[in-house]
């Protein structure tokens, strides 16, 4: 539906110029359409169905057969295909008209229509869901609406095209209908009773390519001009003759029977003429296309029949019977040849892999062949265009040439790979650029291997991942929590005797490790076969020079570039190319080490930093401002290729795709552009030898067909996960099957259960991905986004208009956001001197809000387009949203029209957003909406746009529909997922959600899952009974809960976002399982919780709830500094800070108040020198039935998410542990806990103080569960649903389970290299992006393995030490240990003096600010020369040389040098180096087998 449905429907007709002022940026045609009442008409079907639509074509009634096409593009070509003559065409692609219409009168050099497929529009009428009145494409000269008016063709939008497609499908593909305008009644007409071929065929002979050497007679059944073009450009002179012309006596070198509409049996003269040729001895080759296939079969004596479901789309898979090769084809036909009716001498040439229908025939001895599909495409894929070459070869080679002799031979034959045990490498801890998508892909790979009875060994230190579960039907046979390094992988290969390895499911980490194993000869030595893409092919894609060379071999363009290995060479390369240039690193992840360099100074800086991390960079011409387009390509070992999804970055080149807003499918590309890039994708992937799945990225010039290839990722990637969830096509699962040698046609499409995986999904919706950044956490870090990725997570929203999915996605990213508004997330205020033009030209994480503000400020769309290079089509849509906001704000709540309200919902407005515009609360808006019967519809993702029924329940909600796709009779248990990964909420909460879902299903409960994160396992549709890929908001949860009539809702396993919804959902009638939401509210509110602790006589630090700065100052005078500020209802320590003085107090209090506006901020005395202890537990009606106690390595002051955890505790006294248990017991009772919870304590000696309590699962639940061998979420879920539990084996407070012969260490994973300018020190506010865990026979070996797993490089030579004076009394022993272990010590001047004075030799180095002066060597030089390979820098609030110490830490990070900034970690590291012994490569199972976690 379109803008005209509501606001523009009710707008008064006025002077056009006045309207133009109101809708700045829109074309006059668009303004005219928006300024008058939209004309309506009805679509009436012969069964009596009547659907109202809105006219955007010629306002005249018409009747015909209603059919649907599932193609994702090419509406210009489609409507001019003569095969649609007499038909009312329904396009399931939901958004039509984006690219307008080209010059529809233009002709090419051959005299053929240049941009369309016949002289005029052939469809009798057009039906779409959403029509774009404002178009944007460099090749357009008018709108689709204007063209339809010119040709007097009616068209309606606002039609639920999915509903219509299902109706046509279920009626055996044949439905008569009419578009009927008021006062223009028409009767139903069945065009199939007419000879449609006669109606569209030429009335006279026409010649094209006159003078060409090969004479072809083409019998016109309704020819598409591209068929003629394909022949003429290959040297044919084409004589196009009428359908009933007797060609049997004509002279020709070849005969062609073209495509066309209708029932082939009505073309009797043509059939008779062709039969005469068949029965003669004429040797000339004959080719039939589409209708030509049916005519040929009838002339040969065969039969045709009407298909139960017509094949109309651009993704039909066919197989050639000669060699089994598969192709993706464009099709448009309702009739098919009956294979069983073919007479002797004839046989099928092509077969449809889905429905097994005939797709072409051939004569066994004569040069006659046909295709039911369209090899000329237009629209659609050009995979079978080679058939024109085959036809021309038959002609040119002459008599005696057989079809098999000229048909291309398949490049490869697929053979099942015989492996017994496969090693799958995971990606390790989550980091920026490498997040939860690899948990999803690895889990899928394990599932695929198990289906094929292949044993799996999984190696991944990411303890929080679902794939590293040790038990379950979907889990690997053996799991190793070890670093993904060549050393440890080699040990596992030796121990497990694996004969296969998969490198493509673990991101860059696994890929780089695999390449190194290959280079060292390890894989060859132990007979390990790389499954899927070979290492050689991986190296072609990762090494920038090799990649460039390979593309040059096939003459595919990349940006002019030079691979260099020094800064000097980089500067020389830039001089040759010309500034600006882009640099990219080899073997790097997420654009790390890349950047735009406008000048020599920037290039010198970026190249220096990049070459510190890698040995090669590429300096290339900048294509900033071009469109960035991605294709996901799957290729099997038999050379079958499909492109599963194309994606368009809303942000232009210059912003890393991981930091870009991305839509799928592409919205602003023509069919020509899409098919050009698709064909290139397949060509490149074949040339590189990819086997499995890969991603290819293009830069496409915004106003021409010029493109360059940016890169190829020969592995599963972030984009792969997005494409999988966007389409429903399980890429990782399919890639794993392909890696075993299974060809695509033999793999089932799990969504339909009937069709093959050798196809390309059709979408009748669109998705929008928006990244989630947490840059505000990193003081000093630049807010600019560019070619190096900075986002920590992402969301994906599904809708049937761009605006619907776009606004959904914005809200998914930040619960505080209403949609596309000028209000910043988290209630932030705009700077008083904000420069909107600069904000748009230099992208930041808040650019979308800047654009909204700019539009509202009157900056034109043309200027915004110039500043951002964002296509104007997206800008038109954004402006439409803001126009609706203006309309709503000008409306009265009691009189707002139903159509306006409905339209606002159709373009993605939330109840809360509408309420703010109308002056209503969210609840009042919901009541208003429901009273007007404005409700969402549930739709399925089925991969085939309703062409086949789906057997999975992968769902979303939309207001752009007219029926539900499913029934609501399960009444399942709802589980809320974690939403976008961000700092503090990562894969550990997905693990919790999945564990809960699996438990529910195990005990026989139906499950309804709601989540919006495409990187998660919980959003795998086969993990639950119903998956709603939807917002985690009060409005949407209530929609789903009420539709499904769920038995209850579990909110405690998804982290803080669902936890914050507990009270509002409860107050609106949602049954919350487990602990009461009112108790959750008491625990989340810092002041109430502290008061309860006082009542329970549980010790805590002195505290006070403060409502003003004066309150806070009064408290600090009483207890003294330092103090800790703690807002309520936050995750990962947001706005939590230790303050050491009044100025800090003022700054941090303002921040804490902003993020916690509805609850008081609590200030507590900060206890120094205390150790933090965590209690993870499960309560049952106030009783603790399962618990685990872990100890932090770091003292308090470091956020628990950034801390290094140890199980069992190492330094906590038994007396303190008992106090921890007593306090836990009291809290569980006081809050009547039923479900998971976490309590954090401070311990100093035997003194124990409570810090906080979370009445939900914590991020350490996966770690404690796997370490102890007890799934805490399984237990908690059973408690919450009232399932009976055997408590005898659980680690209760009375019977703790403590590992006896091993220790588990969980270590944080940081992404400092990406956050330029951020200070890599640990504070109260969490900064880590992921975590790992390893196990060892002692704490030291576990610690070192965990550190290595984070990417920490153990030093081999020298260590630089710089410590603040107060650390000296405790540090001397550590320094001595490091010296004794053989490290050469360097130190900043004061630290060096102190060490030397204490007989520990240390070489002094200059402060960064003193570099270049005479005296000690510079830090940078020592690091660059390899003398220093670890830095210990221990600052505190009294540090003198603040800038210099920061410079040292940043230098370490930017050069990839190991860095430690916490004293307790440094101490543990030194002891571990001394006492750890050899680092074994055992799995957790090995430790448990010979020792284990035992009841104490």
UniProtKB/Swiss-Prot annotation:
- Any single GO BP term: 'de novo' pyrimidine nucleobase biosynthetic process
Q: Does the keyword Nucleotide-binding apply?
A: yes
Could you tell me one molecular function GO term of this UniProt entry? metal ion binding
Family annotation (SMART domains): CPSase_L_D3, CPSase_sm_chain, MGS
**What does UniProt give as GO cellular component?**
carbamoyl-phosphate synthase complex; mitochondrion
Q: Which CDD domains match?
A: GATase1_CPSase, MGS_CPS_I_III
EC main group: ligase
Keywords in alphabetical order:
Allosteric enzyme, ATP-binding, Ligase, Mitochondrion, Nucleotide-binding, Repeat, Transit peptide, Urea cycle
- Domain Glutamine amidotransferase type-1 positions: 215-401
Region of interest: Anthranilate phosphoribosyltransferase homolog: 34-214
> Which Enzyme Commission numbers does its entry carry?
6.3.4.16
Recorded protein name is Carbamoyl-phosphate synthase [ammonia], mitochondrial
Source organism: Aquarana catesbeiana (American bullfrog)
């Amino acid at each position: 539906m379109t803008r005209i449905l509501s606001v523009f429907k009710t707008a008064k007709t006025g002077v056009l110029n006045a309207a133009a002022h109101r809708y700045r940026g829109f074309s006059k045609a668009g303004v005219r359409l928006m300024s008058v009442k939209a004309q309506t008409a009805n679509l009436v079907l012969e069964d009596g169905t009547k659907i109202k639509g809105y006219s955007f074509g010629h306002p005249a009634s018409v009747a015909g057969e209603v059919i649907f096409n599932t193609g994702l593009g090419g509406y210009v070509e489609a409507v001019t295909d003569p095969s649609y003559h007499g038909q009312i065409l329904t396009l399931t692609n939901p958004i039509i008209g984006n690219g307008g219409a080209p010059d529809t009168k233009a002709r090419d050099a051959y005299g053929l229509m240049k941009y369309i497929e016949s002289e005029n529009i052939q469809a009798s009428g057009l039906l779409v869901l959403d029509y774009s009145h404002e178009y944007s494409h460099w090749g357009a000269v008018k709108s689709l609406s204007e063209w339809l008016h010119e040709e007097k063709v009616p068209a309606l939008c606002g039609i639920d095209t999915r509903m219509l497609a299902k109706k046509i499908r279920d009626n055996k593909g044949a439905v008569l209908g009419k578009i009927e305008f008021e006062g223009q009644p028409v009767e139903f007409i069945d065009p199939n009773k007419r000879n449609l071929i006669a109606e569209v065929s030429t009335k006279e002979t026409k010649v094209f390519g006159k003078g060409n050497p090969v004479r072809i007679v083409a019998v016109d059944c309704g020819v598409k001009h591209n068929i003629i073009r394909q022949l003429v450009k290959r040297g044919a002179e084409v004589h196009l003759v009428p359908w009933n012309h007797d060609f049997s006596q004509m002279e020709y070198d070849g005969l062609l029977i073209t495509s066309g509409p209708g029932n082939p049996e009505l073309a009797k003269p043509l059939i008779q003429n062709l039969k005469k040729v068949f029965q003669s001895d004429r040797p000339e080759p004959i080719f039939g296309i589409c209708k030509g296939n049916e005519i040929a079969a009838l002339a040969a004596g065969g039969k045709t029949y009407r298909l139960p479901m017509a094949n109309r789309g651009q993704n039909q898979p066919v197989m050639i019977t000669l060699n089994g090769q598969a192709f993706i084809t464009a099709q448009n036909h309702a009739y098919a040849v009956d294979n069983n009716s073919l007479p002797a001498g004839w046989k099928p040439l092509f077969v449809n892999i889905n429905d097994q229908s005939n797709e072409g025939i051939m004569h066994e001895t004569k040069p006659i062949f046909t295709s039911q599909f369209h090899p000329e495409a237009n629209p659609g894929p050009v995979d079978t265009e080679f058939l024109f070459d085959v036809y021309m070869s038959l002609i040119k080679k002459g008599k005696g040439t057989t079809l098999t002799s000229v048909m291309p031979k398949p490049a490869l034959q697929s053979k099942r790979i015989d492996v017994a045990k496969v090693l799958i490498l995971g990606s390790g801890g989550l980091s920026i650029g490498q997040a939860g998508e690899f948990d999803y892909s690895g889990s899928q790979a394990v599932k695929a291997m198990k289906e094929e009875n292949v044993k799996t060994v999984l190696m991944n230190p990411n303890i929080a991942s679902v794939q590293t579960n040790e038990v379950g039907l979907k889990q690997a046979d053996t799991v190793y929590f070890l670093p993904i390094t060549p050393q440890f992988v080699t040990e596992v290969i030796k121990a497990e005797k694996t004969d296969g390895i998969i490198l493509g499911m673990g991101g860059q980490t696994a890929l780089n490790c695999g390449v190194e194993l290959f280079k060292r000869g390890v894989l060859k030595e132990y007979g390990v076969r790389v499954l899927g893409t070979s290492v050689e092919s991986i190296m072609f894609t990762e090494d920038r020079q090799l990649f460039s060379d390979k593309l040059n071999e096939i003459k595919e363009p990349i940006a002019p570039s030079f691979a260099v290995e020094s800064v000097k060479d980089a500067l020389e390369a830039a001089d040759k190319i010309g500034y600006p240039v882009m640099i990219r690193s080899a073997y790097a992840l997420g654009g790390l080490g890349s950047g735009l360099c406008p000048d020599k100074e920037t290039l010198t800086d970026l190249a220096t930093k990049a070459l510190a991390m890698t040995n090669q960079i590429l300096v290339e011409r900048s294509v900033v401002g071009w469109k960035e387009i991605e294709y996901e390509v799957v290729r099997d070992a038999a050379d079958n290729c499909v492109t599963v999804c194309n994606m368009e970055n809303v942000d232009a080149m210059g912003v890393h795709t991981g930091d870009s807003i991305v839509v799928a499918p592409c919205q602003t590309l023509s069919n020509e552009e899409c098919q050009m890039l698709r064909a290139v994708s397949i060509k490149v992937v074949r040339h590189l030898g990819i086997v499995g799945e890969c991603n290819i990225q293009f830069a496409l010039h915004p106003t021409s067909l010029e493109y360059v290839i940016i890169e190829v990722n020969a592995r599963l990637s972030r984009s792969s996960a997005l494409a999988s969830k966007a389409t429903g096509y399980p890429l990782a699962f399919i890639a794993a099957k392909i890696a075993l040698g299974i060809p695509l046609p033999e793999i089932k499409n799990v969504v339909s259960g009937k069709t093959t995986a050798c196809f390309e999904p059709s979408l009748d919706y669109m998705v929008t991905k928006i990244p989630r950044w947490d840059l505000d956490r990193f003081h000093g870090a630049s807010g600019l986004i560019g070619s190096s990725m900075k986002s920590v997570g992402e969301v994906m929203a599904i809708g049937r208009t761009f605006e619907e999915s776009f606004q959904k996605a914005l809200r998914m990213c930040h619960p505080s956001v209403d949609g596309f508004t000028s209000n910043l997330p988290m209630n932030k205020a705009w700077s008083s001197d904000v420069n909107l033009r600069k904000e748009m030209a230099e992208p930041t994480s808040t650019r979308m809000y800047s654009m909204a503000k700019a539009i509202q400020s009157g900056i034109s769309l043309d200027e915004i387009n110039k500043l951002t290079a964002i296509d104007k089509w997206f800008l038109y849509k954004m402006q439409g949203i803001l126009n609706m906001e203006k309309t709503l704000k000008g409306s009265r709540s009691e009189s707002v029209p139903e159509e306006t309200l409905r339209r606002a919902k159709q373009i993605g407005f939330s109840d809360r957003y509408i309420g703010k515009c109308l002056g209503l609360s969210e609840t009042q808006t919901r009541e208003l909406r429901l009273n007007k019967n404005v409700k969402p519809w549930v739709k399925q993702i089925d991969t085939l746009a309703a062409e086949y029924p789906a057997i999975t329940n992968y769902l979303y909600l939309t207001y752009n529909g007219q029926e539900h796709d499913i029934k609501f009779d399960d009444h399942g248990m709802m589980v809320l997922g974690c939403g976008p990964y961000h700092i503090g909420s990562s894969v550990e909460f997905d693990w919790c959600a999945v564990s809960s879902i699996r438990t529910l299903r195990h005990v026989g409960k139906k499950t309804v899952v709601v989540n919006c994160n495409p990187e998660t396992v919980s959003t795998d549709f086969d993990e639950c009974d119903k998956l709603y890929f939807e917002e985690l908001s009060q409005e949407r949860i209530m929609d789903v809960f009420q539709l499904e009539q769920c038995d209850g809702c579990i909110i405690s396993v998804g982290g803080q976002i669902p936890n914050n919804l507990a009270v509002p959902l409860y107050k609106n009638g949602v049954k919350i399982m487990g602990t009461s939401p009112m108790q959750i509210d008491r625990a989340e509110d810092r002041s109430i919780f502290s008061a309860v602790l006082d009542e329970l006589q549980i010790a805590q630090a002195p505290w006070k709830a403060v409502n003003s700065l004066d309150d806070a100052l009064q408290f600090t005078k009483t207890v003294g500094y330092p103090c800790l500020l703690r807002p309520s209802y936050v995750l990962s320590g947001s706005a939590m800070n230790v303050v050491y003085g009044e100025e800090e107090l003022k700054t941090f209090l303002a921040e804490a108040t902003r993020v916690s506006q509805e609850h008081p901020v609590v200030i507590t005395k900060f206890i120094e020198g205390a150790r933090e202890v965590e209690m993870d537990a499960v309560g049952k009606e106030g009783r603790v039935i399962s618990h685990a106690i872990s100890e932090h390595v770091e003292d308090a002051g470091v956020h628990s998410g950034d801390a290094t955890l140890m199980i069992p505790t190492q330094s906590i006294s038994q007396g303190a542990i008992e106090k921890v248990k007593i306090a836990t017991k009291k809290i569980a009772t006081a809050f009547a806990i039923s479900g998971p919870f976490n309590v954090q304590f401070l311990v100093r000696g035997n003194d124990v103080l409570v810090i906080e309590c979370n009445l939900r699962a914590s991020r350490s639940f996966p770690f404690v569960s796997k370490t102890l061998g007890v799934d805490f979420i399984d237990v908690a879920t059973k408690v919450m649903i009232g399932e009976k539990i055997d408590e005898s084996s659980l680690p209760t407070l009375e019977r703790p389970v403590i590992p006896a012969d091993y220790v588990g260490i969980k270590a944080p994973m940081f992404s400092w290299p990406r956050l330029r300018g951020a200070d890599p020190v640990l504070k109260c506010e969490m900064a880590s992006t992921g975590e790992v865990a390893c196990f060892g026979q002692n704490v030291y070996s576990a610690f070192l393995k965990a550190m290595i797993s984070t990417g920490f490089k153990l030093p081999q030579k020298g260590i630089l030490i710089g410590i603040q004076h107060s650390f000296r009394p405790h540090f001397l022993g550590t320094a001595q240990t490091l010296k004794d272990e053989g490290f050469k010590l360097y130190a900043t001047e004061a630290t060096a003096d102190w060490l030397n004075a204490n007989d520990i030799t240390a070489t002094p180095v200059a402060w960064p600010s003193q570099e270049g002066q005479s005296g000690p060597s510079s830090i940078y030089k020592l690091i660059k020369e390899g003398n220093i390979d670890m830095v210990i820098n221990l600052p505190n609030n009294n540090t003198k040389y603040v800038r210099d110490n920061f410079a040292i830490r940043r230098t370490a990070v930017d050069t990839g040098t190991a860095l430690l900034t916490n004293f307790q970690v440094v101490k543990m590291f030194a002891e571990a180096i001394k006492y750890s012994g050899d680092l074994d490569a055992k799995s957790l199972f090995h430790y448990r087998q010979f020792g284990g976690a035992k009841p104490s």
